[in-house]
């Protein structure tokens, strides 16, 4: 029964005037279990014929059938499956992968055939034992002689059963003794039922075959049958696996990717550098933005949450506002009666000289406030008492200090009951409160708080106030409250001669602004990620070029295009992923150092930014690794195997 049937087979190379007719109307059939030698000089077309038989190449025209299946119209993946199921290749130069042990080289075809991992190594060891290399299964190719390497190559050809063994000049790189050993193995495989097709130019080697086909200039010039094929041929054991994607194939691709990265440590590190810098920049910028945003929002909360301050004029940029003094104490009293307002305080202030004993302070601020001011602004009592309604009604000359003023004036002394003189007016200290955060950071002035009635009557004179601060009830929407408050004051004044600063609006504005800045700076930092991705693509293209022969070997033993694609894609993703993790760790280290030396605010790392960084580095690997991986997967097996 014929296992191979070829009819009117032609193969051309090149186009136009450079077109070469390599095989010319070749017709032949090979019986199952036969031992055939194809002879011819270099350039005769014998290797091209063997490549077409072995599904490494396709004919330009004609028919080539393996076990009755036409191969001319098969897809690349179908040809890969056929090579994995039917063929075992023995190459003149062995074509073993230098990074793998003898057993791993032998087991390689079984990965693409889908053989379970538990069986692969055991079968590889058995084959090596059969070929006299049982004690060499852990050796790398460079630790083996030429004859031993060729025996490993033969074992690899038998891994999936090797029903058809294709041997291309199997003794060409060996001495006579090793060559004779290889031929003895081939004769034994023939006895076991394997169909052997051997390409050689040596008549002595060809004499071992049952049949000798001689080719010259792409044509068969002789076909000599020396011995008949035995009528009862034992079929060799062939592994019937699943010829598709599997977990083992993925793990093999992952392992080979790691090996490739480790084999070129410095190159891999330099390739990762762009990714490391990009990820470090993005994560650090986001952490800085988060930290500064949290600090500013914390300071706003220190000024007072859900509060609004009403000022004279049309805005902070209104030059006429200093001359407009339309806010009155009666406005504050009216506002205090509204159901949506929790607390109200009129505000006025004066700057002057503070004298305490024999010490004088020139940067002192005296704030005239209502008794509800501390509730509105969220200031906590630290010592003594706060202002009361009686203090306001009676214009008592009492003051409450903030902590900074207390430390500057009295140091470690108890300030309660002590007298301070502001602009030649004596005031008795009754309490100490927490510092108020103004403008986002504490100021350098000494802050004293006194009843607004006292400041108006005894310091500034007049009845007009600078501002009114209200605290909105927690269950009221601040935007709705602001509209109601605006309409009320407009009705009281007859016009809108004031403006309102809403702490919630400021908070939202700051969040939006810092978010925009983070996005802008992150976008700039993202450019370095793109540059790093281009570097990864360049290195992967170099890697494909360096490992072209390896790709050809994998394809010859049954690897599909998807297997090659995933191997190089995983390598690119690994480089970017490792670079991304390194970038995150470097950013965290920078954050630790930053937080150790900077006390105003800290770098705040978020889980979202770290996860996003990891995903982005992976995405960069996929995007920039795809083109080199696709190039590797689309290589022609013959071209790849011919690469030195």
UniProtKB/Swiss-Prot annotation:
<feature type="transmembrane region" description="Helical">
    <location>
        <begin position="574"/>
        <end position="594"/>
    </location>
</feature>
<dbReference type="GO" id="GO:0005524">
    <property type="term" value="F:ATP binding"/>
</dbReference>
<feature type="transmembrane region" description="Helical">
    <location>
        <begin position="524"/>
        <end position="544"/>
    </location>
</feature>
<feature type="transmembrane region" description="Helical">
    <location>
        <begin position="269"/>
        <end position="289"/>
    </location>
</feature>
<dbReference type="Pfam" id="PF12704">
    <property type="entry name" value="MacB_PCD"/>
</dbReference>
<protein>
    <recommendedName>
        <fullName>Macrolide export ATP-binding/permease protein MacB</fullName>
        <ecNumber>7.6.2.-</ecNumber>
    </recommendedName>
</protein>
<dbReference type="InterPro" id="IPR017911">
    <property type="entry name" value="MacB-like_ATP-bd"/>
</dbReference>
<dbReference type="Pfam" id="PF02687">
    <property type="entry name" value="FtsX"/>
</dbReference>
<keyword id="KW-0472">Membrane</keyword>
<keyword id="KW-0547">Nucleotide-binding</keyword>
<dbReference type="InterPro" id="IPR003838">
    <property type="entry name" value="ABC3_permease_C"/>
</dbReference>
<comment type="function">
    <text>Part of the tripartite efflux system MacAB-TdeA. MacB is a non-canonical ABC transporter that contains transmembrane domains (TMD), which form a pore in the inner membrane, and an ATP-binding domain (NBD), which is responsible for energy generation. Confers resistance against macrolides.</text>
</comment>
<keyword id="KW-0812">Transmembrane</keyword>
<dbReference type="InterPro" id="IPR025857">
    <property type="entry name" value="MacB_PCD"/>
</dbReference>
<keyword id="KW-0046">Antibiotic resistance</keyword>
<dbReference type="GO" id="GO:0005886">
    <property type="term" value="C:plasma membrane"/>
</dbReference>
<feature type="topological domain" description="Cytoplasmic">
    <location>
        <begin position="1"/>
        <end position="268"/>
    </location>
</feature>
<feature type="topological domain" description="Periplasmic">
    <location>
        <begin position="595"/>
        <end position="607"/>
    </location>
</feature>
<keyword id="KW-0813">Transport</keyword>
<keyword id="KW-1278">Translocase</keyword>
<keyword id="KW-1133">Transmembrane helix</keyword>
<dbReference type="GO" id="GO:0022857">
    <property type="term" value="F:transmembrane transporter activity"/>
</dbReference>
<feature type="topological domain" description="Cytoplasmic">
    <location>
        <begin position="629"/>
        <end position="644"/>
    </location>
</feature>
<feature type="topological domain" description="Cytoplasmic">
    <location>
        <begin position="545"/>
        <end position="573"/>
    </location>
</feature>
<dbReference type="InterPro" id="IPR050250">
    <property type="entry name" value="Macrolide_Exporter_MacB"/>
</dbReference>
<feature type="topological domain" description="Periplasmic">
    <location>
        <begin position="290"/>
        <end position="523"/>
    </location>
</feature>
<dbReference type="GO" id="GO:0046677">
    <property type="term" value="P:response to antibiotic"/>
</dbReference>
<keyword id="KW-0997">Cell inner membrane</keyword>
<keyword id="KW-1003">Cell membrane</keyword>
<feature type="domain" description="ABC transporter">
    <location>
        <begin position="4"/>
        <end position="242"/>
    </location>
</feature>
<feature type="binding site">
    <location>
        <begin position="40"/>
        <end position="47"/>
    </location>
    <ligand>
        <name>ATP</name>
    </ligand>
</feature>
<dbReference type="InterPro" id="IPR003439">
    <property type="entry name" value="ABC_transporter-like_ATP-bd"/>
</dbReference>
<dbReference type="GO" id="GO:0016887">
    <property type="term" value="F:ATP hydrolysis activity"/>
</dbReference>
<keyword id="KW-0067">ATP-binding</keyword>
<comment type="subunit">
    <text>Homodimer. Part of the tripartite efflux system MacAB-TdeA, which is composed of an inner membrane transporter, MacB, a periplasmic membrane fusion protein, MacA, and an outer membrane component, TdeA. The complex forms a large protein conduit and can translocate molecules across both the inner and outer membranes. Interacts with MacA.</text>
</comment>
<feature type="transmembrane region" description="Helical">
    <location>
        <begin position="608"/>
        <end position="628"/>
    </location>
</feature>
<dbReference type="Pfam" id="PF00005">
    <property type="entry name" value="ABC_tran"/>
</dbReference>
<comment type="similarity">
    <text>Belongs to the ABC transporter superfamily. Macrolide exporter (TC 3.A.1.122) family.</text>
</comment>
<dbReference type="InterPro" id="IPR027417">
    <property type="entry name" value="P-loop_NTPase"/>
</dbReference>
<dbReference type="InterPro" id="IPR003593">
    <property type="entry name" value="AAA+_ATPase"/>
</dbReference>
<dbReference type="InterPro" id="IPR017871">
    <property type="entry name" value="ABC_transporter-like_CS"/>
</dbReference>
